[in-house]
A protein has these predicted regions:
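Conserved acyl-donor/pantetheine-binding loop and adjacent beta-alpha core of acyl/acetyltransferases
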Residues: 73-105
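A conserved beta-strand-loop-helix scaffold within acyl/acetyltransferase catalytic domains
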Residues: 3, 11-81, 129-269
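Alpha-helical elements of Rossmann-like donor-binding domains used by nucleotide-donor carbohydrate transfer enzymes
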Residues: 113, 202-205, 280
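Non-catalytic accessory segments adjacent to catalytic cores
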Residues: 100-150
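Active-site/acyl-donor-binding loops of N-acyltransferases
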Residues: 1-16, 75-76, 136-165, 238, ...
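A short, internal acetyl-CoA/4′-phosphopantetheine-binding micro-motif in the GNAT/acyltransferase core
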Residues: 98-110, 260-271
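Short, high-confidence coil segments that cap the C-terminus of an alpha-helix
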Residues: 55-57, 121-124, 231, 288-290
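Aromatic (often tryptophan-rich) hydrophobic motifs at membrane interfaces
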Residues: 216-329
Length: 350
């Protein structure tokens, strides 16, 4: 643990940094605005990620006048041009949530204050999954992977109501996936508060399969995360073996699609299985009276064919080396995620 203060032009910046999430959360609870940090910034989630994410994670709080920020930094050696489909490996400190969710890795009332402080941190930095960006000089800026969000309409009482609301070509695609997955059984597994798994299916190899095929690799979580992460697991079983799974988390009126995994050799066309899995996520959300599904990032085209809309996310990049920082500012096209998806017009009119 380390405590320190630094000066800026107006006020002293109070800084509290530590290595353990429970220590940071105990500190934050003394501040009224942080007494009830919501998912995913819960003690259980942060402690589990500390154990299961191999990257070094540190926790930071800064305050100056009315401005404050809590943020997480994880350190890794990464290809900073992954989104631009090039390669340049660099040691990077990422202000981000330490698993592949669409959430940012900070809570603040003043993003400009947070960014100004991050510019002082030595080395290369990325601030990921910013949803409401501000203009800030001296940093690279661009789009990262958007989050896919599906709104669940009030008239959807059953999954059949949802499917009936789709235009014919999208209904046909879903029905085809159902037909081709008719020998796939679906099991629902609840992970209790105690983190006790109550099924015998080993889904971790499926997660590793999908991780290895991912174009945008970040962290690779340990098995323990999937055994103890609180939520609901849907397991898709074919020939008495798990063919796929999804890990879901309920947060108020929102359902969060956290992770998935597949056996890519179990079917001749795994796209059918993926459609089938997404359909069951929609059905689960309707059953649980959710208003929104956060389908997360990646696989945008498939999720858009279910009616999901894209919620933009942005990044900032900075390096204390002036030459490298100039590249971060001017090399936007090499760093950012570029996309041009069609408007599928998934739903029927009226």
């Amino acid at each position: 643990m380390k405590k320190k203060s630094a000066k800026n032009e107006k006020d002293r910046i109070k800084v509290f940094s530590c290595e353990q999430p429970d220590e940071m959360l105990a500190f934050l609870k003394k501040r009224p605005v942080f007494r009830e940090l919501k998912y995913p910034y819960t003690e259980r989630m942060l402690k589990l990620l500390k154990e299961t994410n191999p990257f070094r994670q540190t926790y930071h709080y800064i305050e100056s006048g009315e401005s404050f920020a809590f943020f997480i930094i994880y350190e890794s050696r990464m290809n900073i041009m992954t989104l631009g489909n090039s390669e340049w490996m660099m040691n990077v400190k990422t202000v981000g949530f330490p698993c592949s969710l669409s959430n940012s890795g900070y809570v603040t009332n003043d993003l400009e204050f947070l960014l100004s402080y991050c510019k002082r941190i030595k080395g290369g930095k990325l601030i990921l999954n910013v949803d409401e960006p501000v203009e800030m000089k001296g940093l690279g800026f661009g789009e990262t992977l958007p989050s896919c969000v599906l709104s669940i309409k009030d008239e959807y009482r059953t999954i059949d109501d949802y499917v009936a609301s789709l235009r014919s070509q999208y209904r046909r695609r879903i029905r085809l996936a159902e037909k081709r997955c008719r020998d796939v059984s679906v099991y629902r597994v609840e992970i209790s508060d105690a983190g006790m798994k109550n099924d015998s299916w080993d889904i971790y190899p499926l997660y590793l399969n999908t991780y290895r095929k991912s174009e945008y690799k970040l962290e690779c979580l340990d098995r323990k995360f999937f055994e103890e992460s609180e939520g609901t697991r849907l397991v898709f079983v074919k020939d008495d073996k798990p063919a796929g799974f999804v890990l879901l988390h309920e947060e108020g009126e929102k359902l969060v699609f956290q992770f998935c995994g597949m056996d890519y050799e179990c079917m001749s066309n795994t796209a059918d299985l993926y459609f089938f899995m997404l359909l069951h996520i929609v059905g689960f959300a309707i059953e649980k009276n959710k208003k929104i599904i956060d389908f997360g990032q990646t696989s945008e085209l498939t999720k858009m064919k279910f009616g999901a809309e894209l919620s933009k996310r942005y990044f900032y990049a900075h390096h204390t080396n002036p030459f490298l920082n100039m590249f971060a500012i001017l090399g936007k096209k090499l760093l950012e995620y570029r996309y041009d998806f069609p408007d599928f017009k998934v739903f029927r009119r009226g």
